[in-house]
Amino acid sequence: MDLHNTTAAATHPIYSPTPVPVEQFIDGIRELSAGLITKQKIYDFLATYEIRSEDLERYKMWLPDRHTRNKVFRNDMIEAMVICWPIGAITPLHTHNGQLGWMTMLEGKLIVENYKQLGCNRPENQQVVGIDCLAGATRIEMQNLGTELVVPGGPLNTVDKTQTIHRIKNLEEWNERAVSVHVYSKPIDSCVVFDIEGGRCFRRDLKYDNEPA
């Protein structure tokens, strides 16, 4: 994967968020959730404010073999979390349950690989209320749409309600850990995970690592 040109372009920040106490960050997210939530409103907020480093530390949890999801705030309309990425961490290919999402980098960098589902042998499972898909297909066809590099000060990565599918990687060759902030509306308690090699998909429940099981 040749990322030299992408990395060079991303070294010039397009925004510089102001570090604020986590309480102020939470108050801002809560206030936005009380009104009409739009992709642009949350984008603008995350491009303007970030959790200051001394407060960020309390939300960092590190495991050697996978990323961790650490809740900062949640209500019925929105959730915000800090995700910690050890070296070499890779998520499964997944959906976002038909919700809006935003990701901004605080430390390190990540690669986002975007995909489109072209077809499966359980298309009727997508025609349900309340979730994006029941999953359960045993034959899937996926198309790779390319990659995005996400860095501090670079464009936020966003997902929309039309079943954005991606996976996220912290490449071994970078030899550094990464920390990102994710906001979703509404909160996501489960998603569809795709096993391309096995040609199947299934639903996976999600949890916060900084809360008791």
Regions found by a protein language model. Give the residues of each.
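N-terminal leader/capping segments at the start of a protein or of a new domain
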Residues: 1-54
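A short glycine-rich, His/Asp/Glu-containing loop-to-beta-strand
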Residues: 58-87
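Conserved short histidine dyad/triad with adjacent acidic residue
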Residues: 81-96, 161-163
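Glycine- and acidic-residue-biased ligand/ion/polar-headgroup-sensing regions
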Residues: 87, 98-120
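Short acidic-glycine-tyrosine-enriched beta hairpin
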Residues: 102, 116-165, 206-209
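A short hydrophobic beta-strand segment most commonly corresponding to one strand
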Residues: 102-104, 174-190
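C-terminal edge-of-domain segments
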Residues: 191-213
